[in-house]
Amino acid sequence: MQGKILLRIAYVGTAYCGYQVQPNGITVQEMLNRAAKALFGQDCDVVGCSRTDSGVHARDFRAAISYKGTDVLETAIPEDRIPRAMNAHLPDDIAVLAAKWVRSDFHPRYDVVAKEYEYLIHNGRERDPFLLDRAWHIPTPVSEEALARMQAAAACFVGKRDFSALRAVGADTEAADAVRHVTAATVERTGEMIVFRVRADGFLYHMVRIMAGTLAAVAAGRIDPADLPALIVDGDRRKMGVTAPACGLYLNRVLYPEDL
């Protein structure tokens, strides 16, 4: 067949300098490019749906394979056998979960209609070594009242507006337009884990991590959730919370117009 192959991938980002190939460190894309070359016999580009930062994880990352410098790939390997074949050439912290043929003009990043991220806060009194590099450890207990404030604050993120206040200062972004449409934002607690989930048509640089840091500030009483809508409109990054560590961030789901 001919076209592109869309991969569904999961990875632990701890050992990598983000997704996209760069000269100063090993990235997830570099490992996938190597695996694709080993499988398909020539240089390939494995273009991702997002440029995740160093240390960020993914449960449902999407990337499309084509021969380097082209928009096509040709192979007789059945799509249901590609995941296992790719995984034979990948390290244990990266796994191809599924593969599907898509049209040659499909773009895994620009065809996205929504993404969902999850941020994990471990709220145990003592650190858990099994959560090392998998969650942000905040040992100060979050009361039920503080959790309710976090939930009220998360609701303030929902809507279509300029989110400059939640973008990294000085970020070299592709789009000067900071308007994004957040369709869902929730906070839940399960045992010692506080889970923040957010879905939008796109995200600014460090936006989810700044949201998580802002929610932590709300829990600590440093930001009143009633003030948050005005702070977002004000657009001043300095009035929001810290940028939460990358280790707690997971790309949870990527949505396309088609069921891919």
Regions found by a protein language model. Name each.
Residues 1-260:
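Structured-RNA-binding interfaces characteristic of tRNA pseudouridine synthases
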